[in-house]
């Protein structure tokens, strides 16, 4: 079954991820499984993954999808803006976002949730879609809860 055919609720997705991260102590393994669950469960997306803070930039972490940009400066693009502003960025049309970084020209909308612990940005969760205005309030809330689950694990 392909990702667009799945009809999982946000509660189903959260439950699946919660079970995975509760059983694993390695953050890379947890991020890899979270990216896989989201990529398979969320319809109409073309990329799901993480960028991790390394010095003053975000570096590509575990993901599902096409080849991605490997380094993103803080404050640049949707991911860098989420890290700089320390808040979720939900962009309906990435082509109208100032400084958008087109890692995949097929992407039309994007949502990025920062990973923040004790006031420190550790990285971001990034989800892209080829559909304009793909992400809504319900998915934003769910993705923010996914990040909270990850941060409560042994991250």
Residue ranges of each PLM-predicted region?
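Regulatory sensory and allosteric helical modules in signal-transduction proteins
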Residues: 53-103
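Short loop/turn motifs at secondary-structure junctions and domain boundaries
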Residues: 42, 103-107
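Short hydrophobic/aromatic beta-strand element in the GNAT-like acyltransferase core
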Residues: 47, 112, 124
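Intrinsically disordered, low-complexity terminal regulatory regions
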Residues: 1-62, 66, 145, 149-154
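Well-ordered alpha/beta subsegment
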Residues: 135-142, 152-153
């Amino acid at each position: 079954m392909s990702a667009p055919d799945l009809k999982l609720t946000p509660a189903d997705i959260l439950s699946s991820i919660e079970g995975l991260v509760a059983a694993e102590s390695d953050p890379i393994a947890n991020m890899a499984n979270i990216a896989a669950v989201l990529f398979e469960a969320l319809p109409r997306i073309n990329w799901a993954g993480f960028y991790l803070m390394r010095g003053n930039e975000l570096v590509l972490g575990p993901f599902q999808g096409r080849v991605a940009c490997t380094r993103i400066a803080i404050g640049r693009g949707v991911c860098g803006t989420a890290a700089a502003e320390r808040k979720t960025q939900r962009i309906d049309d990435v082509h109208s976002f100032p400084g958008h970084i087109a890692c995949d020209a097929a992407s039309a909308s994007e949502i990025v949730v920062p990973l923040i612990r004790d006031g420190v940005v550790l990285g971001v969760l990034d989800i892209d879609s080829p559909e304009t205005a793909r992400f809504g309030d319900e998915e934003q809330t769910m993705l923010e809860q996914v990040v909270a689950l990850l941060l409560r694990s042994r991250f």
